[in-house]
């Protein structure tokens, strides 16, 4: 028995090192035009719209968005295999076989489309320009610093700024992928996933995963529909259930029965979920109650509840200080690693007459075969550098002329300077993302808020100028790193760079129309969107607005002792990150993430409780059956997220049609209930 077990392990180890490309060696790789098919684009549009709704919902609730790459790849595989089988059974002749290259095109297009729902700033810089967020920030109302959302200008703005990043990194694709051999962990993981789908064993597992995803999609959608019946007023429904008591509920400690964030908790690392809950306990459990006892001393007692000169100011600005401290540390860390790695790469290339394709010794012949095969096809379909550079210049000129027409507060020279600096930042972000899998696009955007906001003037619309510059920078930098990730995925699945680029361009174009349309649906259907305590509070919009105010007006408007607390938390964020990097791995995995801790400082810990319940489910599942949990936890989580997210569409339609939920389920204390009963008893009977 021992021998047979050892032989089985040896066979498994031998199978593990078998070349991926030798498995697919007998299959013809289609040309790039045959990879970008009409059926692939149709499926991409469907999935892109679905994921845009999901990302938009997450964006407008907490801003925590997990990776949906697994779901996109899995659903793309399922829909296209089902499509080809149906046509085959219908007797349609010459049905083109579904290949992993086509699967990669779908994956790229879907992620590019849904990515605009995040980088488009609908939960951050664009919505931060509105009067609704301006009124919450406590600033004096100034029409120069307000621009309300409108479908026309949002679509136009996104089309102008979202393509420059793609053209900025095209000339560097060979350097990034082949010469420097950057890992791009997410792109590599996606490629492994797609390659596995197209093996017999992987296809069988994928069918089971899709079945599991579909089951939990239906459950989550049905649960959202059921909950809707009980939300017939403010503070009604399961999302206002005081599961831990009324006092805890007043301090945002409750489970709101959100299938979305239970699913998010199952996907996110344990440390992220624990950090969110810890931040909620520290802020809403300790700090805010203590500061509220200082009402009348630290801040006036007669302020509106939403005033930034009161308790809300502490919540917002301390949260911002944590975010900025964490962002600054990671920015310097990634830039240091990027610079060091670049210097080492250049020295190595100068000292060697040729750069070995295999990447050095110690690799097996099978790995060398994979590298040679992939490099050969990656270099086959070139994208002319002159075309990319010319397109960048043309789009930049058009953008410099048109963006100031959309945002008259932003001058043409602000945009021009952004486009001169952007390619360097796009390269740094793409390179750093390849090393660490960490995109700093939002950090570069925040830098633009402060620099352009300070450059402009408050009386001249500096707040809008800073926010618009943030959008320009994020639009360029985020799409650049996304494209290089896709080049890595295409490299490992033998998809042509041209098909990757074309699908990214098409997906981005889809996103520039779909994402604003989805946001507009939310904006028109839910009239309290962006308001504290609503279903869609959009916390990042207020954070970005106040960053712009700080950039323009300075620190004079902060409440008493708020600046001292902000400095303390800013330094603490840097110190915790430094401790995480210096500590041993066994210790570092218990140190919290400041960025995750910052999110509940303003919103409250309720969604952190949801996420920790998701973590607990995943932890127990891992303990009981680790192999099954690894295979099926992501589809289950994706089903929970997608079902609840897609329910938002019919919910929006019902709201637009004026159909209101028939029941209000609300919870009262015993003493309040006695008063309500007494009041009702005095009413005349009908």
From Swiss-Prot:
Keywords attached to this entry: Membrane, Transmembrane, Transmembrane helix, Transport
Membrane topology: Multi-pass membrane protein
Example of a GO cellular component annotation carried by this entry: membrane
Residues of the signal peptide: none
Segments crossing the lipid bilayer: 36-56, 60-80, 109-129, 151-171, 212-232, 271-291, 316-336, 383-403, 415-435, 461-481, 501-521, 556-576, 597-617, 639-659
Cellular compartments annotated: Membrane
Alphabetical list of Pfam families matching this protein: OPT (PF03169)
Molecular function terms from GO: oligopeptide transmembrane transporter activity
Similarity comment: family membership: Belongs to the YSL (TC 2.A.67.2) family.
Role: May be involved in the transport of nicotianamine-chelated metals.
NCBIfam families xref list: OPT_sfam
UniProt-recorded name of the protein: Probable metal-nicotianamine transporter YSL10
Organism name: Oryza sativa subsp. japonica
């Amino acid at each position: 028995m021992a021998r047979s077990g050892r032989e089985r392990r040896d066979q498994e180890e031998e199978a593990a090192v078998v070349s991926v490309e030798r498995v697919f060696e007998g299959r013809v790789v289609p040309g790039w035009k045959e990879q970008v098919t009409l059926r692939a684009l149709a499926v991409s549009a469907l999935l892109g719209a679905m994921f845009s709704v999901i990302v938009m919902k997450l964006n407008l609730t907490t801003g925590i968005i997990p990776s949906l790459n697994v779901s996109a790849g899995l659903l793309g595989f399922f829909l296209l295999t089902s499509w080809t089988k149906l046509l085959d059974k219908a007797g349609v002749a010459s049905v083109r076989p579904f290949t992993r290259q086509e699967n990669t095109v779908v994956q790229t297009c879907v992620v590019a489309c849904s990515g605009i729902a995040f980088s488009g700033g609908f939960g951050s810089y664009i919505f931060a320009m509105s009067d609704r967020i301006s009124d919450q920030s406590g600033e004096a109302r100034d029409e120069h610093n307000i621009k309300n959302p409108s479908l026309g200008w949002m679509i136009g703005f996104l089309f102008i700024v979202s393509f420059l990043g793609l053209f900025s990194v095209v000339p560097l694709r060979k350097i990034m992928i082949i010469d420097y051999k950057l890992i791009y962990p997410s792109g590599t993981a996606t490629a492994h996933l797609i390659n596995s789908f197209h093996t017999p064993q992987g296809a069988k597992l994928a069918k089971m995963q899709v079945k599991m995803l579909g089951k939990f999609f239906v459950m989550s959608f049905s649960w959202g529909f059921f909950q809707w019946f009980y939300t017939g007023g403010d503070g009604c429904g399961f999302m206002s259930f005081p599961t831990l008591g009324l006092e805890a509920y007043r301090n945002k400690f409750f489970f709101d029965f959100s299938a979305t964030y239970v699913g998010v908790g199952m996907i996110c690392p344990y440390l992220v979920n624990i950090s969110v809950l810890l931040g909620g306990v520290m802020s809403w459990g300790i700090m805010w109650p203590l500061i509220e006892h200082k009402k009348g001393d630290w801040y006036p007692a007669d302020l509106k509840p939403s005033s930034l000169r009161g308790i809300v100011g502490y919540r917002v600005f301390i949260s911002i200080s944590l975010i900025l401290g964490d962002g600054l540390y990671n920015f310097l860390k990634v830039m240091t690693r990027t610079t060091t790695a670049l210097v080492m790469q250049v020295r190595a290339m100068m000292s060697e007459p040729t750069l070995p394709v295999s990447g050095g010794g110690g690799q097996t012949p099978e790995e060398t075969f994979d590298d040679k095969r992939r490099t050969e096809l990656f270099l086959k379909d070139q994208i002319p550098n002159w075309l990319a550079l010319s397109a960048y210049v043309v789009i930049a000129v058009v953008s410099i002329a048109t963006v100031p027409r959309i945002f008259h507060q932003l001058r043409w020279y602000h945009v021009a300077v952004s486009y001169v600096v952007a390619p360097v930042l796009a390269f740094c972000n793409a390179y750093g993302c390849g090393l660490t899998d960490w995109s700093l696009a939002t950090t570069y955007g925040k830098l633009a808020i402060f620099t352009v906001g300070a450059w402009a003037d408050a009386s001249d619309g500096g707040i809008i100028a800073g926010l618009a510059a943030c959008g320009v920078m994020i639009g360029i930098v985020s799409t650049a790193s996304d494209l290089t990730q896709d080049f890595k995925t295409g490299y490992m699945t033998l998809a042509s760079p041209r098909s990757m680029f074309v699908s990214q361009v098409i997906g981005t174009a889809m996103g520039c129309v779909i994402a604003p349309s989805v946001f507009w649906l939310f904006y028109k259907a839910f009239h309290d969107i962006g308001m504290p305590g609503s279903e869609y509070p959009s916390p990042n919009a207020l954070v970005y607005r106040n960053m712009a105010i700080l950039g323009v007006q300075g620190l004079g408007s902060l409440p008493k002792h708020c600046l001292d607390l902000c400095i303390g938390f800013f330094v603490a964020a840097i110190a915790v990150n430094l401790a995480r990097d210096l500590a041993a791995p066994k210790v570092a995995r218990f140190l919290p993430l400041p960025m995750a801790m910052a999110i509940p400082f303003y919103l409250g810990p309720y969604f952190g409780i949801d996420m920790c319940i998701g973590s607990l489910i995943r932890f127990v599942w891992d303990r009981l059956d680790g192999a099954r949990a690894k295979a099926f936890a992501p589809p289950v989580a994706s089903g929970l997220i997608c079902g609840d997210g897609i329910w938002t569409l019919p919910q929006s339609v019902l709201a637009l049609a004026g159909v209101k939920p028939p029941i209000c389920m609300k919870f009262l204390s015993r003493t309040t209930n006695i008063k309500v009963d007494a009041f009702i008893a005095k009413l005349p009977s009908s």
